[in-house]
Amino acid sequence: MHHWDEEESEKLRQFRTIENPNQVIKYTDPRYLEDITISTGRLARKVTSSHKFSYFLYKLINHLGFERILEAGTSLGINASYLGSSKAKRVWTMEGIEEIADLAIERFEKLEFEHVRVVKGLVEHTFRDSLGLNPDLIFIDADHRSEAIFWYLRIIKEMNVRVQCIVIHDIYWSHDMNKAWKKIVADDRYTLTIDIFEAGIIFPNYPIEKQHFTIKF
């Protein structure tokens, strides 16, 4: 993969800036039906991937020439801004909370990212249709439960999506997530898996004998 470009990295880091960090948003958590009041600045700190990881995804997409990207879990659209800045021609990102999705849409409009589309609705309701994008890379960062991860993988298989790369964020989020990752690594269907700690990377049906790598990242 191309080397780390400090100038390019710093240019992309600007996406982490929240324009109105004290803006308060209110929404209902769709899973737990809990009313949430939080500032956009705090929400960004709570859910956003590290700059290092987002830049890694950007480089991965460019290096492997991926053109269609599907992200599960938009939040404020910070990570998707990195994806939208890559050479990918189409980026679809799914967000289940309408109030948050609207903020992401506003961000992409200001960036003039016409090739980035926010898919509103719970991911379990929108994932199947979104696979119609025929993504080269799928980034999963919406639901940190093993049952959700295996549901994503099952739907991908059922719909015979020829995705080249699946990235699962936060594989060390919990014992449950790590157990799921270990099960994926042991699955013969996934011939190439890579653990970079912040995420697990799967290359389904890669034409090699089964291999797994752990990379300090």
Predicted segments with their positions:
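A short alpha-helical cap/connector motif
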Residues: M1-F139, D143-C165, I171-F217
